[in-house]
Amino acid sequence: MIYIDASNHIYGRLSSYVAKKLLNGESITIVNASKVVITGRKEFIIDKFNNLRNTGSIRKGPYYPKTADRILKRSIGDMLPKKKTHGMEALKRCMVYANVPKSLENKNFERIESAMNKKVTGFITLGEISKILGETYE
């Protein structure tokens, strides 16, 4: 079981790292998903997520999530082979939390150095995006 503190990690790099580990058969728990950063200009990133949410219709998908933990889990799932059983089983081994739950406060969390946001100044967090998209709880 791997525990990852996702604060100040880059969205895509973290997702691809976790997807590879899941396909290798490991179980992963990610906390602080609301503190994951997406690099780029805020206006373009917000427009991208708004356009994703507005595609399709109410009755037919695709359905895109509003909350930070579900946005991150969907991006990890998009990197897995969903139509194969090992891809579906891999996604079941991944747990994502927006903050640190009380049951996991005493665990030792890893930080992935290859996915850290070190010098990039233009970014927005998943927590900010989810508030803009209309997340109703925290």
From Swiss-Prot:
Source taxon at top rank: Archaea
Keyword Ribosomal protein: yes
Entry-linked InterPro entries: Ribosomal_uL13, Ribosomal_uL13_bac-type, Ribosomal_uL13_euk/arc, Ribosomal_uL13_sf
Keywords: Ribonucleoprotein, Ribosomal protein
Disulfide bonds: none
GO cellular component, one term: cytosolic large ribosomal subunit
Family, per entry: Belongs to the universal ribosomal protein uL13 family.
Functional summary from the UniProt entry: This protein is one of the early assembly proteins of the 50S ribosomal subunit, although it is not seen to bind rRNA by itself. It is important during the early stages of 50S assembly.
Protein name: Large ribosomal subunit protein uL13
Gene encoding the protein: rpl13
